[in-house]
Amino acid sequence: MCSKEHAFNKSVLPSQQIRELLRKKQIFSNLNFEEDQIQPSSIDLRLGSKAWRMRASFLPGIQRKVSSCISEFAMQEIDLSNGYILEKGSVYLVKLQENLNLPENIEGIANAKSSTGRLDLFTRLISDYCDEFDRVIKGYSGPLYAEI
């Protein structure tokens, strides 16, 4: 379960441990990672080429995968490989390039880069079996999505 398991004494992984997760394919992508994606205590996630315009914002909850919710809430599938202009006031779901296969003792927290706020965008991370935005459960294995 995603919520109600958080403690306030969690630590942050330094870039060396993030690189180790990449080396062990516990964070992986079909494309090569760029060195500038790895920050002192975080990794920048990248949008993939597949997106959906959604009826509304949603969370899959602790029983469902995001992919099973897409057919229920998607209005349009979008290919982002040649660019796309997002409509203001609409909700989009974008599959990220990065996937996870985390060890049982590691969970994730996401927050948007400040540049997204300056562009007047509101983004949140969504993962399978989670009832909170911007959280990834311990030992999570699967894809990641951004809600825009």
Where are these regions (language model features)?
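Non-catalytic terminal segments and appended small domains
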Residues: M1-I148
